[in-house]
From Swiss-Prot:
Keywords: ATP-binding, DNA damage, DNA repair, DNA-binding, Nucleotide-binding. GO terms for molecular function: ATP binding; ATP-dependent DNA damage sensor activity; damaged DNA binding; mismatched DNA binding. ATP binds at residues 632-639. Belongs to the DNA mismatch repair MutS family. This protein is involved in the repair of mismatches in DNA. It is possible that it carries out the mismatch recognition step. This protein has a weak ATPase activity. GO terms for cellular component: cytosol. The keyword DNA-binding applies. It comes from the Bacteria. This is DNA mismatch repair protein MutS. One of its GO terms (biological process) is mismatch repair. InterPro entries: DNA_mismatch_repair_MutS, DNA_mismatch_repair_MutS-lik_N, DNA_mismatch_repair_MutS/MSH, DNA_mismatch_repair_MutS_C, DNA_mismatch_repair_MutS_clamp, DNA_mismatch_repair_MutS_core, DNA_mismatch_repair_MutS_N, DNA_mismatch_repair_MutS_sf. SUPFAM superfamilies: DNA repair protein MutS, domain I, DNA repair protein MutS, domain II, DNA repair protein MutS, domain III, P-loop containing nucleoside triphosphate hydrolases.
Length: 894
């Protein structure tokens, strides 16, 4: 048992300060406690050991309590954010314990309390947040039937930095997909065995926090949600029937409020998400399409990194949300594209470049508003909010010029009206360039508060006051050598030499007698002294009081600030889409109620940006042509063609323009991808198991409105098993699912599928042999491929020439066997060739790939080691015989 745990069992044995600490720690088990002591936050006992290990701090021992040494580690208060950021990234939570009592008047330890708890899912400080991605806290409530089997999962997730709260209910088998979409930083679950057994968090899920099961009570959760939203019922939000989600929301709100130590004033709206509202993207699809993260785990190059030319961080965060939530309803996409078109066609005075220039003056008022609601906004947050509001009229003028051409822009224009009372208050109250922290002063503007101005004047103009007083007193008394001075012992005084003391007025009171002078103080100087000696301290205290009152006065404007922030984010993202469309030569797609996908000269948006020249391709999927069998060599571009089709479709439904000459889309409900695979070591699944699991999900869930990408299904097992599975899966997709499918394969036998199913068609990506190498054309053509070029690709990859030669010989042998035994050619595209061609092939290979046999290699090495200038005639003759024998060796006969 650790000292901290043991010590807590008998608090009375400890020193008063340790008693205080242990009581606070007992209320926050499992959380690191940052205990404020002067200019440091200290950690004790096991917390100190853990923090020292995680943060690379020095672990010390100072004194003892209850007979045990006190282990300590500390961080300076002015740098606490950087340490909090490290701990949060490691999934730790930290309770911030501040001194709230006055050390000067406290008897015993200064009173302290936890003012907030920083957890991975409840971040609001700018220093702890990523500018371009949101942080979500999610709670999960699981409903069970009488047999204890999970039947439904309620989800509630909150972006505390903005106040956005959302609910959803999903089937238990859809939880992983929901978490992949939301990407919560922290997940709250009930601390009951039934919930723990019914759900296993994915490997990349956020930090898991267990809370008491009663937090998820549906009745109290529903009431807590109504109280938070200030409504009598949830019917207006469409959440009245989501009992499980309401239970999750109750636990989430209780936890979030506890971490902040106050109400969540900015959480006043609710959005219910339904599966039918968005195009379904399972975890594999989100990864394979590399929307916001590459397969290597980096943020670039991705679709998001290509599109993100936003001028504000609010727009960048909205972009990520839109990419992961493409709406199924084409009307949403069409409204966004209409707005993009209006921005691109704007008159010169309201051009998209001019608009984006104005947007660059905008601050992240979404997060500023969140901190304002939590009363944690800093002075520069308020000045940024003020400056943003001041910049809005110019921005609105430009938006108003194009608003008549797009309903979305008209709505945005109306939402950009700032709350004038808030603007005026900020202009009057906040200094033009305030200090970073209130404690530094210089935050409240001059003229806002007369008392503060007077205190500042006293503090700043003390010297001038003394000069003015000295001048006046000399004139009043006629004492020419009178001096007004100050020292730390006696304070302010008027000094008069002994020879002039008879001229001292009656209101002078003697303060000190010196050998040659008398020192006096007057009522006026005493009053000034009282003010001056405490002016700076009182000014800072007054400023703190005024600042706190200002934050309270700004609270009623939070809904207006949120409205403006939301409009700015949407405007910024639409303008970024317009800039990308113009710069990258993208076009507006069209939509139809008829099923199908028609893309003319489509391009992969991300790959195109990485290469000098990209080959555009067409893609046509119709009710009469539902499945394209794609064949061709490795590296020929099959996967790129498939991914670009899915990305163009997703971009269209997000509302962006698309990389194509023309594009038209029918309804799409889900996008599935089965592209590539790797072992799931953590889940105990092989590559083939992962592949089959993804294929099963597609076969079970794809509908006639789904877009499916299948890349080389069946390759992870034996040739016959793989071919049989690939054939059966393709047939099932055609006959039962009826979905739009791009099916890439190396099984040449599958190219016979269109003979059985007219809805299938063959296309291929071609390549040509050039000299001794291969050139990939990356062009999609009708019909099946006739060669795989596998050996040429292996050669390009650097496989040793000896291995390539051996492969060619074995390939010819297999082809001869295939010709002798009439059976399907498996996995190979090449026409069977007789063994008689082996020698000719080898001769050609030798010319194409000048391999060096072992004997020849020895000969070459021997020659390299000889210097002819050093050989005597006899040595040269002996060497000649030696080299002749080497050259005559069997392996050198080439």
């Amino acid at each position: 048992m650790g000292i901290q745990t043991a010590a807590a069992n008998d608090v009375a044995q400890h020193t008063p300060m340790m008693q205080q600490y242990l009581r606070i720690k007992a209320d926050h088990p499992g959380t690191l406690v940052f205990y404020r002591m002067g200019d440091f936050y200290e950690l004790f006992f096991e917390d100190a050991e853990k923090a020292a290990r995680l943060l690379d701090l020095t672990l010390t021992q100072r004194g003892a309590s209850a007979g045990n040494p006190i282990k300590m580690a500390g961080v300076p208060h002015h740098a606490v954010e950087q340490y909090l950021a490290k701990l949060v990234k490691l999934g730790e939570s930290v309770a911030i314990c501040e001194q709230i009592g006055d050390p000067a008047t406290s008897k015993g330890p200064v009173e302290r309390k936890v003012v907030r708890v920083v957890t991975p899912g409840t971040l609001t400080d700018a220093a702890l947040l990523s500018d371009k991605s949101d942080v979500y806290l999610l709670a999960m409530c699981v409903a069970h039937n009488r047999r204890g089997v999970a039947t439904s999962v309620g989800l509630a997730w909150l972006n505390l930095a903005s106040g956005a709260l959302r609910l959803a209910e999903v089937a238990p088998d859809q939880v992983a997909a929901a978490l992949e979409r939301i990407r919560p930083a922290e997940i709250l679950v009930a601390d009951t065995p039934s919930d723990s057994a019914s759900w296993t968090p994915p490997v990349n899920a956020g930090a898991l926090t267990r809370v008491p099961v009663w937090h998820f009570d549906v009745t109290s959760g529903t009431q807590r949600l109504c109280d938070q939203l200030e409504v009598a019922g949830l019917d207006g939000f469409g959440a009245h029937s989501l009992t499980c989600a309401c239970g999750a929301a109750g636990a989430l709100l209780l936890y979030a409020a506890a971490t902040q130590g106050q109400q969540l004033r900015h959480v006043r709206s609710l959005k219910v998400e339904y599966e039918s509202e968005y195009i379904g993207l399972d975890p594999a699809t989100r990864r394979n399409l590399e929307l916001t993260e590459t397969l290597r785990g980096t943020e670039s190059p991705t679709l998001c990194s290509l599109l993100d030319t936003c001028c504000t961080t609010m727009g960048s965060r909205l972009l990520r949300h839109w990419l992961h939530h493409p709406p199924r309803e084409s009307a949403v996409a069409q409204a966004r594209q209409q707005a993009i078109g209006a921005l691109l066609d704007a008159p010169p005075g309201a051009s998209i470049d001019s608009l984006r220039g104005a947007l660059r003056q905008i601050s992240d008022i979404e997060r500023i508003t969140g901190r304002l609601a939590l009363l944690s906004a800093r002075p520069r947050d308020l000045s940024s909010l003020r400056d943003t509001f001041i910049a809005l009229p110019e921005l609105r003028t430009q938006v108003a010029a194009v608003a008549p051409n797009a309903d979305s822009l008209a709505r945005i224009d109306a939402s950009l009206e700032p709350p004038q009372a808030c603007v005026e208050l900020l202009k009057r109250a906040v200094a033009q360039e305030p200090s970073a922290m209130v404690r530094d002063g210089g935050v409240i503007a001059r003229g806002y508060d007369a008392e503060l101005d007077e205190l500042r004047d006293i503090s700043e103009n003390c010297g001038q006051f003394l000069i003015d007083l000295e001048t006046r007193e000399r004139a009043r008394t006629g004492i020419g050598n009178l001096r007004v001075e100050y020292n730390k012992v006696h304070g302010f005084y008027i000094e008069v030499t002994r020879g002039q003391t008879d001229k001292v007025p009656d209101d002078y009171r003697r303060r000190q007698t010196l050998k040659n002078a008398e020192r006096y103080i007057t009522p006026e100087l005493k009053t000034f002294e009282d003010k001056a000696l405490s002016a700076q301290e009182r000014a800072l205290a007054r400023e703190r009081s005024l600042y706190d009152a200002l934050l309270q006065a700004l609270l009623p404007f939070i809904p207006d600030c949120q409205r403006v922030a939301s409009a700015l984010a949407e405007l910024d993202l639409l303008a970024a889409f317009g800039e990308r469309a113009r710069a990258l030569d993208w076009v507006a797609p069209t939509f139809s109620a008829n099923a199908g996908i028609e893309i003319e000269q489509g391009r992969h948006p991300v790959v195109e940006a990485q290469v000098e020249q990209f080959i555009a391709n067409d893609c046509s999927l119709t009710p009469e042509r539902k499945l394209l069998l794609i064949t061709g060599p490795n590296m020929g571009g099959k996967s790129t063609f498939m991914r670009q089709t899915a990305l163009i479709a997703l971009l269209a439904y997000v509302g962006s323009y698309v990389p194509a000459r023309r594009a038209a889309f029918g309804p799409i409900d889900r996008i599935f991808t089965r592209i590539g695979a790797a072992d799931d070591l953590a889940g105990g699944r092989s590559t083939f198991m992962v592949e089959m699991t993804e294929a099963a999900a597609i076969l079970n869930d794809a509908t006639p409105q789904s877009l499916v990408l299948m890349d080389e299904i069946g390759r992870g097992t034996s040739t016959f098993d793989g071919l049989a599975l690939a054939w059966a899966i393709a047939r099932h997709l055609l006959a039962h699912n009826g979905c739009h499918t791009l099916f890439a394969t190396h099984y040449f036998e599958l190219t016979q599928l269109p003979a059985e199913f007219p809805q299938a068609a063959n296309v291929h990506l071609s390549a040509v042999e050039h000299g001794h190498g291969i050139v990939f054309l990356h062009a999609v053509s009708e019909g099946p491929a006739n060669q795989s070029y596998g050996l040429q690709v292996a050669q390009l990859a650097g496989v040793p020439n000896a291995v390539i030669r051996a492969a060619r010989k074995h390939l010819a042998h297999l082809e001869q066997q295939s010709a002798a035994q009439p059976a399907p050619q498996l996995d190979l595209f090449a026409t069977p060739m007789p063994m008689l061609l082996e020698d000719a092939d080898d001769e050609r290979d030798a010319k194409a790939e000048p391999a060096v046999p072992p004997a020849m290699q020895e000969l070459v090495e021997r020659l390299r080691g000889i210097d002819p200038n050093d050989l005597r005639p006899r040595e040269a003759l002996d060497l000649l015989y030696e080299l002749h024998e080497l050259a005559a060796a069997p392996d050198a006969d080439h």
